[in-house]
Amino acid sequence: GIAYVSYNTYPGWHTMEEVRQLMLFANRGHDESTHKEKVLRGKTVGSLIGAQILNYDNLKERNSKFLGALRSVMQKDDYYVGHDHLEPHNDPCYLYQFNNHLKAHNLAYVGDADLTLSMVRIYDESIADKLEQLAPNSQADQEQYLDFMLDTTFRKSIICKASAAKDISYAVSNPAEVNTIPVRTVINNFTFQILFDEEALEMFENTLVKDTFQALIKDGGTFNMIEALAILKAAHEASSASDDELEPAVCSLYNAVVEHMVRGGIRFYKTFPEKQEYMEGLSYVPTRFTNLVKAIADGGGEYIYCGNSFNDAIGDISEEDLMFMELLNKPKSKSTLTKKIKDTIFSADKSQTGKHQNAMAEAFYN
């Protein structure tokens, strides 16, 4: 199996540490304050200090890196600021230190969940070559040099047991190997979800690849390689292009998919999360889930937020959301739910007849 560990990293956190110490200093003597009050105080003082620095050109130039870090923190959500900058324990490390710690515990480093921090071949070829020259036998060391270049502040490392390390391959990120049979076999096992829209299609130089992605986006953006290749071949036939143009287009398609897998334009799944459909008389929301969401809505949002099956953050939870979660605390019939919807939402509207209220509740249910 694998495990996921996220942590703050040097060298980027050397500057972030200055912001953290400023916020801790601003909150000294305020132990009785709530977490939210401490975050507000830290942000207020940070904004004040930043504004003073900006008033003087010499200070602005000398502290440009600190100002960048401060600006970044000011724009973050309160829960993040509280977690990273006001918690008593925050011990960043370099990637090589993290890797040494893994080795000492019979574990191995696989890569980063942010593939741009691991797949060094997506960068300029000269950069990738230089990193390989600096650390020819160590992927982790190449990434450490990359961290110095990017001033990385945060990593999301994927790790495994040392005994499984022999199966790790980074060939998928190498343009020279993307169209080999082993790499194509790996890519063919995923389901993909396109995150960019049609306006971004101009980035594809190959017309057949562009037409393929346009068709996939119009079809909802979720696909596998069998479907994508079928669309590409149909586009090739429709364009009356020569047979010699098909294989280069297939290679370009694989290259495009891999590049956007790494850069974040395409999500990829070994098992695509299926949407759970509501089933009358069967579906319900366990009380423990409702209680958790209620705790988040009642102030827990300072510390934690909800996410969906794609690991996207869910915004503000409304009273209406909670109401429906509570209504569905056990399986109910449609008639029971529509009556409760009518009584809860529409019965107060005296301008509507009972018949109209029933119709609105029915429409709301559907």
Identify the function of each model-found stretch.
Residues 1-10, 92-95, 110, 160-163, ...:
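Catalytic cores of nucleotide-enabled group-transfer and carboxylate-activating enzymes in metabolic
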Residues 17-23, 65-88:
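Short, glycine-/aromatic-enriched active-site segment of Class I SAM-dependent methyltransferases
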Residues 120-135, 140-155, 159, 200-366:
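Long, charge-rich, low-complexity alpha-helical segments
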Residues 2-62:
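Conserved class I S-adenosyl-L-methionine
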Residues 170-214:
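Charged, amphipathic alpha-helical linkers/stalks
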Residues 36-60, 162-189:
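Flexible, glycine-/basic-rich loop-and-beta segments that form/coincide
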Residues 10-17, 117-121, 166, 275, ...:
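Flexible loop/turn segments at secondary-structure boundaries
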Residues 83, 89-169, 174-178:
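Glycine-rich, aromatic-lined ligand/substrate-binding cores of catalytic
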